[in-house]
């Protein structure tokens, strides 16, 4: 019984500690570029890191290393901060991420954000064949040319700048497209680049007009696209209601943990009482048995003397 009791005590203590400990995780922050992730050379880039209310520190990381730190000043409790990157150049272009801290607890790292610097090289020219006005169901090819030798060309549709098509060539690259539908309508620009993060000036826009009644969405581009309006910083201040809800949620969690811990302690006390009663009954039985044995021996001794 004693070994079982010790095992139950250890289990109860472990459970009570796990119940009493708060969940040691924070939501992953969201990193965004304000206005656009394509920033002209020598202009300022602004990145937003959106975390949780009550965060005391935000860190911006560039290519895995610490780049900048921002600490929100009370009493303005907001759910994120803005990092300003002045004088954009090729050394500051690359992959960014952010984390934040509440008390001594750090969040997970955000997803990666690619920040691109533009206007690094000459301006390419963009054309489309067979022409800028086609019928739905036809195939078209965009041609991007940059007389300054490069290694990669990029084609973007205005309003969907995250849907980047890449093609490789020294002076010119082709971007075949189609069969086109009305979903392909819009203005396109191209860039030249030596890497993923330093691009040339944008070409003049070429507007593709698609006529016809075919509205087969299965022929539209399958890559995920994001409107440019997605690139915006949605930072909000904490309202009184949000504070009250957060306080109530924290209080409810503490009460739940305390209640569960109390139940565990009650169960342990019951086990201790049961063990004590069991030991007491065992001792009483042993005492009665010893007394009875003594009397039996005494009576036997008297009988032998007679």
Swiss-Prot record:
Alphabetized, the UniProt keywords read: Cell membrane, Disulfide bond, Glycoprotein, Immunoglobulin domain, Membrane, Receptor, Repeat, Signal, Transmembrane, Transmembrane helix
Give the signal peptide as a residue range, or say none if absent.
1-21
Q: Where would I find the Ig-like domain in this sequence? A: 42-100, 137-192
The tissues in which it is expressed are: Expressed in NK cells.
Q: Which residues are glycosylated?
A: 216
Q: Where in or outside the cell?
A: Cell membrane
Gene3D superfamilies per the UniProt record, alphabetical: Immunoglobulins
| Alphabetical GO biological process terms | immune response-regulating signaling pathway
The membrane topology of this protein is: Single-pass type I membrane protein
Q: Does the keyword Metal-binding apply?
A: no
Q: Its GO CC terms?
A: plasma membrane
Residue intervals on the Cytoplasmic side: 279-306
Record-annotated membrane-spanning stretches: 258-278
Concerning Pfam families, the annotation shows: Ig_2
Q: Is Hydrolase included in the keywords of this UniProt record?
A: no
Its assembly, as annotated, is: Interacts with CD3Z and FCER1G.
Functionally, this protein is described as follows:
Cytotoxicity-activating receptor that may contribute to the increased efficiency of activated natural killer (NK) cells to mediate tumor cell lysis.
Family membership: Belongs to the natural cytotoxicity receptor (NCR) family.
Recorded protein name is: Natural cytotoxicity triggering receptor 1
Q: What is the lineage of its organism?
A: Eukaryota, Metazoa, Chordata, Craniata, Vertebrata
């Amino acid at each position: 019984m004693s070994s079982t009791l010790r095992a139950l005590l250890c289990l109860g203590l472990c459970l009570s500690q796990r119940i009493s400990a708060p969940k040691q995780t924070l939501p992953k922050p969201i990193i965004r570029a304000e206005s656009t992730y394509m920033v002209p050379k020598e202009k300022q880039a602004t990145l937003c890191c959106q975390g949780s209310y009550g965060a005391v520190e935000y860190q911006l990381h560039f290519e895995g290393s610490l780049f900048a730190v921002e600490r929100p000043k009370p009493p303005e409790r907001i759910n994120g901060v803005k990092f300003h990157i002045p004088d954009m150049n090729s050394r500051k272009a690359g992959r960014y991420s952010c984390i934040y801290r509440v008390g001594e607890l750090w969040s997970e790292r955000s997803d990666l954000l690619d920040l691109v610097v533009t206007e690094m090289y000459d301006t390419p020219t963009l054309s489309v064949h067979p022409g800028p006005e086609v019928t739905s169901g036809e195939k078209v090819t965009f041609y991007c040319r940059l007389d300054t030798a490069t290694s990669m060309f990029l084609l973007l549709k205005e309003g969907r700048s995250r849907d980047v098509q890449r093609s490789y060539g020294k002076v010119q690259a082709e971007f075949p497209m189609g069969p086109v539908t009305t979903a392909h309508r819009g203005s396109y620009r191209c860039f030249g680049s030596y890497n993923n993060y330093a691009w040339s000036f944008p070409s003049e826009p070429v507007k593709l007009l698609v006529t016809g009644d075919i509205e087969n969405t299965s022929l539209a581009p399958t890559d995920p696209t994001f409107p440019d309006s997605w690139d915006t910083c949605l930072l909000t201040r904490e309202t009184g209601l949000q504070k009250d809800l957060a306080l109530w949620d924290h209080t409810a969690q503490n009460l739940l943990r305390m209640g569960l811990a109390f139940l565990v302690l009650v169960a342990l006390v019951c086990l201790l009482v049961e063990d004590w009663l069991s030991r007491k009954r065992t001792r009483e039985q042993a005492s009665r048995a010893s007394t009875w044995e003594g009397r039996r021996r005494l009576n036997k001794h008297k009988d032998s003397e007679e």
